[in-house]
Structures are given as structure tokens and as C-alpha cells.
């Protein structure tokens, strides 16, 4: 208010907004107390108990690794899950989510070894496992604190950890059931192998980075021929010692090509020009050679006393190389398959640490990548190297060590993808799952269609042991249903440490004998299960079973989980249940910096959700930021974008504050019945109904960014700019118990309660604070989304909207008058409004209502001779701003005809003041 009004003798009679709800949020300071209030009041538990017997909605939480603090991506993931659970609960569902943590595996073991430093070499396996368990427990606690701070609702005594004895036992049990049904086998196949970590890797543990490899063209001499060779191309010279054949494609045409030196080379016709371009060697076609002729050829290995045979496979293409593919069944998936068909055993003269064994004595003990230059020199010395250059390409690396991987054949435990038509059944089931975004189905289908058998075993310390034994007499592997069940019971009681603390005989049922030789002497295996198998069986360990339908309604994780958790969860569920574990799969993109780069400590571009957001702005700002994102795509974020969201929050908070202030002295019990409400208030309740309907639909579709946009628009335009402006006069100047004021107060009460409930899943702290400030005793989370369809009034909306389209023209006309210093407050103005199509606005709404809508003192169909202050028109209406002849009421500032002289009150204000 102006200084003039402060001195106004009537200022104390004006009902200005009054509330203890602070304009300054101070969220960072206030929120912890609210968290304690929710915990002590057991609100989450009550929320679920209140909805027992209602339709169930289960969101299965994908477990993050228990290492390191939560980053912004974790925050996004967990907050979206929290929004979903709360919105489903408010929609009437029995909604539940049990937070979980992935506690075994390489990420934790490697970090513990790193922390040990030089002491790592002195640390035994038992002590290492103890340290890993302690480390995981520590970060479950730390991440749990983060979770409480921004997630709000979860029960700390109701979580799952993959290292708990019950969960570990379920892992062994599911492995046993899969083994019993024939899905698990032991075999020697090429797998991704980390020579730095000395263990196999699953496809989900692989990252691709640019890598420079040697590109060489090698001549394999044809046995029994002079100066005739088969030309192969490879970027892995180190695999040549394991070469057992050369692979062709029967659909490709091959020929002998003569070089300038007189040598003849076999290669694909379609690649001759490319080879010449790359190598600079001129090639002249001599004659074609058929597939039958190729099949009988044998080739001398370039530097081993061994013959390589002809093979055929559809994986050979004309995309690159020579069309003649160097084949080492021990070092490649396609190589293994064609070799298996030809009866070739996978041969890999490389040990766990990537060093050649005595099977390649020439370079025994040398690391394979270090051997590349020596092998190239060896080929050059023998005159079998046609060309050598460097080749940059995308190459698989370990997700943990960030070092290049190799393909290496080792004895491993595998899950059969094609047993019992599992792949076909899984693809069919995928079609029945709802994938959001829709492209998710294409991504996972392509991966499931081509995925090789899943390598389940790892050669590390920290994980669930595979309960397999080896007969000490004959070397036969022993594992069966009885032994697995026996061991499962032991794990359930004492955890996986029992595998290491007990002798083999004590881990097997009494009387166990080798099925091959009858011996009762066994030794324990050293393999542990892939950590992806741990999380993959979480639907069995954590969720209840439902008859003939998936146990989870929703999985929500990053889009990288199409090749990770979504698959590792799918396979066991399809094999044992015959259905997928989820009905719907929703994914989010990566959180990137403002320039689209991944966030990292080394780049210094990260945003810490606790230090940079919660401790400065509060958790509700972080939650509002998450809701503002279309998280289905990658998300760019910087500190500036958080400031913008903070500003938008301030507008929302001020809307709540204005509502509370105007409701001072008015409670829900004082609301007027529907039939007594003013048309203007009914119109905005109709708009509230549509707003609520849209928001609830957006929650249902997980389109929270649209809720954010609608909320900002509703608060800043529909309410603050329009409705609050229109009813300010009656709320401030009408008698407290007047029908018009109570009508608007009733509408404001409905708006406040509805906004509180609708925003609670996102602005959880603020919504609860407002709810309590409005005198409510129970939590906002014990309410339901309101059904406001009865407020919907299409006829009333059409009626008001037809008039409100003039409001924009009026405001522009008023602004012109202000800019020309002819007008201060809009109440100092009268209006002449002329419709160019002949519409008479006073026939649609009473003149008094039009004055309220336009926030002016008078509205005329025709200027009664008043001075014109400004003029504005569009194609439908023309508006003149007029200067009223009446003086201003000193209390309400309106210029009305019932004021006799300056300083007198208008009739309405006289009756109020008395």
C-alpha cells in the first residue's frame, strides 16, 4: 500500500491478507523438521494402511550400487519414483516401493582394493570380503541419509540388500531352479574378459570408447601351392596365434587376384578395389573360385606349425576387409560358432592376466597388447605382411577399469538363451509390456534377438558363490538339486561366508558321492555369480507373487538398463514364471551438464544434489526441478537452470501465501453451498476442475513436466493475474460475512485444498506446510485426489470466456493510458467497449460483473461524454479508457455514482464501516 493509504483512516477496516505462512521459504532449514514429523507420525505407513484392500501398484526399485554418494542422476531416479508412489496413493491405489541396494560385485571390490593401497597384496580373501561387506554397509547408510533428505517417504526398516542372508539364499535358490530346469550349463566359450581385473564381463558391464588398433593384411599360404595365398584382414594381431581357420561366405563371389610381384591372392571380388585403395597394391583378377573349391583348401599358419582350414559363415560380409575372415574360435563369438559347427575346440593360449601361455612358447609371458608389434614384425620377416596401418574404432572396455577387454575362451557357467524356446517366448512377452518411451521396445527386442548365452560366472572374491564342487578323484563337476537346496538353507541361516569357512564335505548333504567314480572327496569351486544375476532375481527375493501376472507394475531406470537390469530381470522370470517381471517399463535419459557433457569430478562440471541444491535451495526445489524435465530424453542442467526453477517455486509459494492470507478467518466449515456461489467463482471452480483433471491425467501418464508447466500457468496467470485481481476488491473491502466475499472465500478454500493435494507428490514439503497452515490436522498424504467433475460447467465457461477475450484488449488500452501518465490505478478508469460484430457484453454478463472482470470502476456501452484517456482495438473489439467524473472512494478507490463529495465513502463501504 502507498504512504497515502497508510495514513488513510479507513485502512484498518480493509481486510488485507493475513497469514503466518512465511514468504521466505527457508526450505533448507525447515525441511529436516518436517521429515522427523513424517517419521514420528509414520505417515508413509498410514498412507498405505489407509488404502489396504485397494488395487495394488508396485514399483520395483532397481538397486543402485552401494558405493559412493548419490549424484544428480540418482536424485532424478529416486525423486521420480517417489512422485509416482505418492501420486498413485493419492489416486487411491495401495502403492508400494521397497528401496534396495546392490552390494556385491566388482565396483565395491575394486574400490576396497584401491582404498587398501599397498596393503591389498597382504589382504587375504576372507578379510577382503569382510571389508567389502563393511564398505557396502557404510554406503547403504550414507545413501539412505540422502534418500531421506529428498525422497521423503520410505521405511528405513523395510529395505532390501543383495548381501543380506535371505537375499543371498534366494539368489542360490533361483540359480538352483534354473539349473534343475536345464537353463544353466558349464562350457568353454569366448567371453569378454578383463585382463586387468582377471574376470569375465557381462555385456551390461561393457562400455565402448575410441581405441587405436593395428590394421594388418596377412597372407596365409595355400598348402600345396606356390606363391598362392589367402588374404585376411585383422585389427587384433595378438589373436593370430589362436587362428584355426579362414571363414568365407557362400553367397559372396571370390577370385584369385595377381599382384605386381606375381603372387596370387584369394579375396572377395567386391572388396578388391577397397583393398587396393587401402594397401596401394594393384590387383588383377586371374580367375574365380567357387565355394566348393574353397572348401577343400587348407592354409599354412603364418608362424605356427599348424594347418588352418576353410570355414563358412553368414557373419562374413563385404563391409570391410577382404571377405576372408581370420577365425580363432577361442577369441570371438562368431569364430566360436563356426568353429563349433566344424568340430573345432576353442583354443586360447592366453592366461587370466592376458599373457601368452606355454601354448605359444615364442612369446610366453608377454601381454597380448604388448605382443602386437612383435607379431607384426614376425609376419614382415616371413614376407607374409601385405600392409600395416593404424585403425581407430569403437572398442569394448571394462566399465570398472576403463581398460580394453579381450575375447577369451574359458570354462564358465552360462545361461541358455534358446533352451525351451526361451528367446522366442521372451520376445513375445516383450510385445505385451508397455514401454515408455515407445522406442524402448525396439531397443530391447534388438538386444534380446542377438544376445549370446549369458555368462553367469565371475572369477572374483566378493559375490555369491556358485555351489559347484569338483571330484578330487576324477575331476568331474558335481552340482545337483539336492546339494543346491542343502546349501541354500545354510546360506539363509549364516550368509555366503559359510562357503568359505566350512569344508566341502560340510557343505554337501551327508553321503554325497561323485556320480562318475563314486568318490566322496570334493573340493569347492572358485566362481561367483555375476552381480547382474543378483539384481536380476530381485523380483523373486523382494516382491510377492501374483497369479498369472507380473509381480511389478512398473520398472523405472535409466535407458542403459535395456541391456542391463531389464534383461537380467527378464530371463529368470520368463524361465521360471513364464511371464516378465514387469507390466510397464519407463526410462529416463542421462543427466548432462549445460553443454551436453557427462558430469564428472575430473571435469569439475558436476552438481552435487546435497551441497549444490538441497543445502542452498531445499529438497522441494530439487523435486520441482525434476518435475520440470521431460526425463525420457537426456537432460542438460546447470546451476542457472536451478535458479530459474527456484524463481518459479517462489511464484507458486506466493500463490499459496496469498490464498492462505485471504482465507484468514474462513474455514472449510464456513464454505457456502454450491447453489449460493457467485457465477464468477463458479467459473474459476470450473477451470479448477479442468486443471485437476489434466494434472491427474499427467500423473497417470508420468508426464510430470506437463504438470510443472500447467501449475506455473495456473498460479501465475489463471489465479494471480486474473482471478485474484478480479476478486481483490470484494476480498479486501466487502464485509467479512457478505455473501459475495464468502462466495469467493469458498472458491479460494477449494482452490487451496486442491492445489495442496495436486502438488503434494512433487512439492511434498511445501504442500504439507500449506496444509497445516490451513488448519488441517491430518497429513495431506492421507487425502485422495479430488474428483471435481461436479464443478465442471461448460456453459458457464463459454459465457465467461467470450467476455474474457476482451480483457486483453482492455489491459492494452489501460497500459497505453499509464504509459502516457494519464492513469494510475485501473480503478481510476471507466471503459467504453464496442463489439465489432454487434455483441452486447452486458447481455452476457451484468455490468457490475464486467467491472469486476476488468478491474475498473465503470463499463459503458457508449461513452456518456467522458474524457478519453486512451484507445486500443483489435479485429473484434475497440476499447476507450475514460476518465470518470465521480470522485474516488477513499476506502476502496472505486469511482461510483453514489459518492456525493470528495472524502465520502461509497455506499458499499459505508455499510461495511457503519
From Swiss-Prot:
Keyword match Protein biosynthesis: yes
Enzyme class: ligase
GO biological process, one term: isoleucyl-tRNA aminoacylation
Cofactor(s), by name: Zn(2+)
Positions with a binding annotation for L-isoleucyl-5'-AMP: 557
Residues spanned by motif 'KMSKS' region: 598-602
Reaction equation(s) it catalyzes: tRNA(Ile) + L-isoleucine + ATP = L-isoleucyl-tRNA(Ile) + AMP + diphosphate
Motif 'HIGH' region: where in chain: 64-74
Any one Gene Ontology cellular component term annotated for this protein: cytosol
Entries under SUPFAM superfamilies matching the protein: Anticodon-binding domain of a subclass of class I aminoacyl-tRNA synthetases, Nucleotidylyl transferase, ValRS/IleRS/LeuRS editing domain
MF term (GO), any: zinc ion binding
Compartments where found: Cytoplasm
Keywords: Aminoacyl-tRNA synthetase, ATP-binding, Cytoplasm, Ligase, Metal-binding, Nucleotide-binding, Protein biosynthesis, Zinc
Pfam families, sorted: Anticodon_1, tRNA-synt_1, zf-FPG_IleRS
Enzyme Commission number(s) from the entry: 6.1.1.5
Cofactor binding comment, as recorded: Binds 1 zinc ion per subunit.
Binding positions (Zn(2+)): 889, 892, 906, 909
Annotated residues for binding of ATP: 601
HAMAP family registered for this protein in UniProt: Ile_tRNA_synth_type1 (MF_02002)
Job of this protein: Catalyzes the attachment of isoleucine to tRNA(Ile). As IleRS can inadvertently accommodate and process structurally similar amino acids such as valine, to avoid such errors it has two additional distinct tRNA(Ile)-dependent editing activities. One activity is designated as 'pretransfer' editing and involves the hydrolysis of activated Val-AMP. The other activity is designated 'posttransfer' editing and involves deacylation of mischarged Val-tRNA(Ile).
PANTHER family for the chain: ISOLEUCINE--TRNA LIGASE, MITOCHONDRIAL (PTHR42765:SF1), SOLEUCYL-TRNA SYNTHETASE (PTHR42765)
Family statement: Belongs to the class-I aminoacyl-tRNA synthetase family. IleS type 1 subfamily.
Entry note about domains: IleRS has two distinct active sites: one for aminoacylation and one for editing. The misactivated valine is translocated from the active site to the editing site, which sterically excludes the correctly activated isoleucine. The single editing site contains two valyl binding pockets, one specific for each substrate (Val-AMP or Val-tRNA(Ile)).
Assembly, per entry: Monomer.
Protein name, UniProt field: Isoleucine--tRNA ligase
Organism in which the protein naturally occurs: Leptospira interrogans serogroup Icterohaemorrhagiae serovar copenhageni (strain Fiocruz L1-130)
Amino acid at each position: 500500500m502507498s504512504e497515502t493509504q497508510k495514513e488513510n483512516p479507513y485502512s484498518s477496516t480493509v481486510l488485507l491478507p493475513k497469514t503466518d505462512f512465511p514468504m521466505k521459504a527457508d526450505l533448507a532449514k525447515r525441511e529436516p523438521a518436517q521429515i522427523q514429523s513424517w517419521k514420528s507420525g509414520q505417515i508413509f505407513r498410514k498412507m498405505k494402511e489407509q488404502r489396504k484392500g485397494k488395487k495394488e501398484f508396485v514399483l520395483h526399485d532397481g538397486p543402485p550400487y552401494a558405493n559412493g554418494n548419490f549424484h544428480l542422476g540418482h536424485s532424478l531416479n529416486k525423486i521420480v519414483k517417489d512422485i509416482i508412489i505418492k501420486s498413485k496413493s493419492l489416486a487411491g491405489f495401495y502403492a508400494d516401493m521397497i528401496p534396495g541396494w546392490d552390494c556385491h560385485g566388482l565396483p565395491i571390490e575394486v574400490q576396497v582394493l584401491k582404498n587398501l593401497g599397498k596393503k591389498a597384496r597382504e589382504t587375504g580373501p576372507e578379510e577382503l570380503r569382510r571389508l567389502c561387506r563393511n564398505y557396502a554397509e557404510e554406503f547403504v547408510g550414507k545413501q539412505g541419509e540422502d534418500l531421506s533428505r529428498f525422497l521423503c517417504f520410505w521405511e528405513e526398516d523395510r529395505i532390501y540388500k543383495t548381501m543380506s542372508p535371505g537375499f543371498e539364499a534366494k539368489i542360490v535358490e533361483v540359480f538352483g531352479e534354473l539349473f534343475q530346469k536345464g537353463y544353466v550349463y558349464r562350457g568353454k566359450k569366448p567371453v569378454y574378459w578383463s585382463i586387468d581385473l582377471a574376470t569375465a564381463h557381462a555385456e551390461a558391464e561393457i562400455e565402448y570408447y575410441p581405441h587405436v588398433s593395428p590394421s594388418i593384411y596377412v597372407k596365409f599360404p595355400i598348402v600345396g601351392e606356390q606363391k598362392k595365398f589367402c588374404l585376411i584382414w585383422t585389427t587384433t594381431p595378438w589373436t593370430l596365434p589362436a587362428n584355426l581357420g579362414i571363414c568365407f561366405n557362400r553367397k559372396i563371389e571370390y577370385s584369385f587376384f595377381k599382384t605386381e610381384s606375381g603372387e596370387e591372392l584369394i579375396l572377395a571380388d567386391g572388396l578388391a578395389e577397397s583393398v587396393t585403395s587401402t594397401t596401394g597394391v594393384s590387383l588383377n583378377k586371374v580367375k574365380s573360385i567357387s565355394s566348393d573349391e574353397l572348401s577343400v583348401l587348407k592354409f599354412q599358419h603364418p608362424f605356427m606349425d599348424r594347418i588352418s582350414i576353410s570355414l563358412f559363415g553368414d557373419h562374413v560380409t563385404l563391409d570391410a576387409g577382404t571377405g576372408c575372415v581370420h577365425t580363432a574360435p577361442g577369441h570371438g563369438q562368431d569364430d566360436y560358432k563356426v568353429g563349433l559347427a566344424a568340430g573345432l575346440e576353442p583354443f586360447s593360449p592366453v592366461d587370466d592376466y592376458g599373457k601368452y601361455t606355454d601354448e605359444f612358447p615364442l612369446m610366453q609371458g608377454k601381454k597380448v597388447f604388448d605382443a602386437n608389434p612383435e607379431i607384426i614384425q614376425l609376419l614382415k620377416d616371413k614376407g607374409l605382411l601385405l600392409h600395416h596401418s593404424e585403425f581407430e574404432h569403437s572398442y569394448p572396455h571394462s566399465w570398472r577399469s576403463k581398460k580394453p577387454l579381450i575375447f577369451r575362451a574359458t570354462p564358465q557357467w552360462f545361461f541358455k538363451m534358446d533352451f525351451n524356446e526361451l528367446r522366442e517366448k521372451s520376445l513375445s512377452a516383450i510385445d505385451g509390456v508397455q514401454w515408455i518411451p515407445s522406442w524402448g521396445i525396439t531397443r530391447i527386442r534388438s538386444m534380446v534377438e542377438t544376445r549370446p548365452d549369458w555368462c553367469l560366472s565371475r572369477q572374483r572374491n566378493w559375490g555369491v558363490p556358485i555351489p559347484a564342487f569338483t571330484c578330487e578323484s576324477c575331476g568331474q563337476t558335481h552340482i545337483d538339486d539336492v546339494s543346491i537346496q542343502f546349501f541354500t538353507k545354510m546360506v539363509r541361516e549364516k550368509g555366503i561366508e559359510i562357503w568359505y569357512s566350512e569344508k566341502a564335505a560340510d557343505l554337501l548333504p551327508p553321503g554325497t558321492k561323485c556320480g562318475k567314480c563314486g568318490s566322496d572327496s570334493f573340493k569347492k569351486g572358485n566362481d561367483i555369480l555375476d552381480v547382474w544375476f543378483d539384481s536380476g532375481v530381485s523380483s523373486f527375493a523382494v516382491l510377492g507373487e501374483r497369479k498369472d501376472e507380473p509381480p511389478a507394475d512398473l520398472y523405472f531406470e535409466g535407458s542403459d538398463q535395456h541391456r542391463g537390469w531389464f534383461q537380467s530381470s527378464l530371463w529368470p522370470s520368463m524361465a521360471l514364471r513364464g511371464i516378465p517381471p514387469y507390466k510397464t517399463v519407463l526410462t529416463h535419459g542421462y543427466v548432462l551438464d549445460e553443454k551436453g557433457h557427462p558430469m564428472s569430478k575430473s571435469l569439475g562440471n558436476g552438481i552435487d544434489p546435497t551441497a549444490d541444491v538441497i543445502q542452498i535451495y531445499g529438497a522441494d526445489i530439487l523435486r520441482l526441478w525434476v518435475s520440470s524435465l521431460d526425463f525420457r530424453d537426456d537432460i542438460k542442467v546447470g546451476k542457472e537452470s536451478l535458479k530459474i526453477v527456484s524463481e518459479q517455486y517462489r511464484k507458486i509459494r506466493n500463490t499459496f501465501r496469498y490464498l492462505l492470507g485471504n482465507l484468514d478467518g474462513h474455514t472449510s466449515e464456513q464454505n457456502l453451498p454450491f447453489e449460493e456461489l457467485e457465477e464468477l467463482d463458479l467459473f474459476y471452480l470450473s477451470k479448477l476442475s479442468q486443471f485437476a483433471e489434466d494434472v491427474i491425467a499427467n500423473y497417470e501418464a508420468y508426464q510430470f513436466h506437463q504438470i510443472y508447466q500447467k501449475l506455473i500457468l495456473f498460479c501465475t496467470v489463471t489465479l494471480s493475474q486474473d482471478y485474484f485481481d478480479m476478486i481483490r476488491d470484494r476480498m479486501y473491502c466487502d464485509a467479512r460475512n457478505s455473501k459475495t466475499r464468502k462466495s469467493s472465500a469458498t472458491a479460494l478454500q477449494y482452490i487451496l485444498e486442491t492445489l495442496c493435494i495436486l502438488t503434494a507428490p512433487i512439492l511434498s514439503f511445501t504442500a504439507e506446510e500449506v496444509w497445516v497452515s490451513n488448519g488441517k490436522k491430518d497429513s495431506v498424504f492421507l487425502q485422495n485426489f479430488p474428483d471435481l467433475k461436479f464443478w465442471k460447467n461448460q456453459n458457464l465457461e463459454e459465457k465467461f470466456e467470450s467476455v474474457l477475450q476482451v480483457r486483453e484488449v482492455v489491459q492494452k488500452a489501460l497500459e497505453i493510458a499509464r504509459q502516457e501518465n494519464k492513469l494510475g490505478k485501473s480503478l481510476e478508469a471507466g471503459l467504453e467497449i464496442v463489439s465489432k460484430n454487434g455483441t452486447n457484453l452486458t447481455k452476457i454478463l451484468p455490468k457490475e460483473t464486467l467491472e469486476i472482470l476488468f478491474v475498473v470502476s465503470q463499463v459503458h456501452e457508449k461513452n456518456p461524454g467522458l474524457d478519453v484517456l486512451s484507445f486500443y482495438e483489435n479485429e473484434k473489439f475497440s476499447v476507450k479508457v475514460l476518465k470518470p467524473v465521480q470522485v474516488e472512494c477513499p476506502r476502496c478507490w472505486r469511482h461510483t455514482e453514489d459518492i456525493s463529495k470528495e472524502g465520502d465513502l461509497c455506499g458499499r463501504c459505508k455499510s461495511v464501516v457503519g
